[in-house]
């Protein structure tokens, strides 16, 4: 009897076959990107050629490793694993690696970034700054070792020795190079006293020169207020730094020549030009001052100098009158306040004196009451023993004891019975 399989059973069987097949565990495909729309995380698109289409999935972690931007219609080389999706019965490739077909990833990234920045206008001629004819201070962003800095120093000293060179030691290739290049460009701008800046390095592969193609470097050059001369690689090497820089030189020597005057004749012409500008400026200033002097000489003040002081004299008189009035008002006000204070203080002072007088009289009378002679005059006597001790109680004496009794008109001796 014929046994019929369910669709699910068949799909599971095929899925197991696919997963166990060593040829399908790692497949190398070439094709054209189709139906690509960038998503926040995982990417879903198709690979096609003239005869077939296969769905493709690329997980977020793998997609972030790409050195170029995927585009619709781009030819690529893909490495991945074939799998079946049971609900739809369709097969697809899970891509692990993806590179452009026929062009290097860096070359493609170069063209994509160049297109993006050009669309923003970063390479437009209208943004280019003119190089100064005579640079007193030159910033150099390059490696501290190697022929580049030596060639620049030699050329500047030969052509315009009065120029000062300030080197910003910079890593020019490898990891972190772009960050150092852009950082030193910004640091030179923060200093603010450079006439021109040279950035560059010697020749090398596209990988060696790539630091000068990074977006952060291009934007740092674009934002620089200092005119920048780019000298990266050999004459045949082209970087994005060359497109955005204010000027490009094929060699470090050529860059130094752009930053300095050509010959002694240029220096003489420049000196003559400065002399002419100074003469014209002084002539113009003298003319303005002469016209102003002539205008002033026709004024009333110069024809009648005494009138120059009329206004000041009148103002001084008004100020003196005002000062006199203010002084009189101030004195009158103080006199009035004094009189008010005196009227309040005199009655108060009289009351205080009278009160103190009464209290003194009371104290005096109290003291009189305590006078011993007054007490004896009222019939009281003072009794003391033989030692002069005052007798205050019966318990202070004993029988037969001799006592002194002091009266108002004399003293008598008595004996206790």
Swiss-Prot record:
InterPro entries: Exonuc_VII_L, Exonuc_VII_lsu_C, OB-fold_nuc-bd_dom. It comes from the Bacteria. It catalyses: Exonucleolytic cleavage in either 5'- to 3'- or 3'- to 5'-direction to yield nucleoside 5'-phosphates. GO terms for molecular function: exodeoxyribonuclease VII activity; nucleic acid binding. One of its GO terms (biological process) is DNA catabolic process. Keywords: Cytoplasm, Exonuclease, Hydrolase, Nuclease. One of its GO terms (cellular component) is cytoplasm. It is found in: Cytoplasm. Its EC number is 3.1.11.6. It is an enzyme of class 3 (hydrolase). Pfam families: Exonuc_VII_L, tRNA_anti_2. Its main location: cytoplasm. Heterooligomer composed of large and small subunits. Bidirectionally degrades single-stranded DNA into large acid-insoluble oligonucleotides, which are then degraded further into small acid-soluble oligonucleotides. Belongs to the XseA family. This is Exodeoxyribonuclease 7 large subunit. It comes from Lactococcus lactis subsp. cremoris (strain MG1363). The lineage of its organism: Bacteria, Bacillati, Bacillota, Bacilli, Lactobacillales. The gene is xseA.
């Amino acid at each position: 009897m014929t046994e019929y399989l369910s669709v699910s059973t068949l799909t599971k069987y095929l899925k197991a076959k696919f997963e166990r097949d060593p040829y399908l565990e790692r497949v190398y495909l070439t094709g054209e990107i189709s139906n690509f729309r960038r998503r926040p995380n995982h990417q879903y698109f198709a690979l096609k050629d003239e005869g077939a289409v296969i769905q493709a999935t690329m997980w977020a972690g793998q997609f972030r490793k790409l050195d170029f931007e995927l585009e619709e219609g781009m030819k690529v080389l893909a490495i991945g694993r074939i799998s079946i999706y049971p609900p739809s019965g369709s097969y697809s490739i899970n891509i692990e690696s993806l590179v452009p077909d026929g062009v290097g990833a860096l070359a493609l990234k170069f063209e994509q970034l160049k297109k993006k920045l050009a669309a923003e206008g970063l390479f437009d001629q209208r943004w280019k700054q003119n190089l100064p004819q005579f640079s007193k201070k030159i910033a150099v962003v390059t490696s501290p070792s190697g022929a580049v800095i030596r060639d620049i120093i030699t050329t500047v000293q030969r052509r315009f020795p009065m120029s000062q060179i300030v080197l910003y030691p910079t890593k020019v290739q490898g990891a972190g190079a772009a960050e150092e290049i852009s950082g030193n460009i910004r640091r030179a701008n923060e200093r603010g006293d450079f006439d021109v800046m040279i950035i560059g390095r010697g020749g090398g592969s596209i990988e060696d020169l790539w630091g000068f193609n990074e977006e952060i470097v291009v934007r740092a050059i674009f934002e620089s207020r200092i005119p920048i001369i780019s000298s990266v690689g050999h004459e045949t090497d082209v970087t994005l730094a060359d497109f955005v820089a204010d000027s490009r030189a094929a060699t470090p020597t050529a860059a130094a020549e752009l930053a300095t005057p050509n010959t002694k004749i240029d220096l003489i012409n420049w000196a003559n030009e400065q002399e002419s500008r100074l003469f014209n400026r002084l002539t113009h200033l003298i003319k303005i001052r002469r016209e102003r002097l002539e205008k002033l000489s026709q004024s009333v003040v110069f024809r009648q100098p005494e009138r120059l002081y009329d206004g000041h004299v009148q103002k001084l008189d008004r100020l003196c009158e005002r000062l006199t009035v203010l002084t009189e008002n101030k004195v009158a006000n103080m006199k009035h306040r004094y009189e008010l204070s005196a009227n309040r203080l005199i009655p108060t002072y009289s009351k205080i004196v009278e009160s103190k007088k009464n209290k003194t009289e009371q104290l005096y009378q109290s003291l009189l009451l305590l006078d011993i002679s007054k007490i004896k005059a009222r019939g009281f006597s003072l009794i003391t023993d033989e030692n002069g001790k005052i007798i205050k109680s019966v318990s202070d004496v004993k029988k037969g004891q001799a006592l002194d009794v002091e009266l108002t008109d004399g003293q008598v001796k008595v004996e206790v019975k």
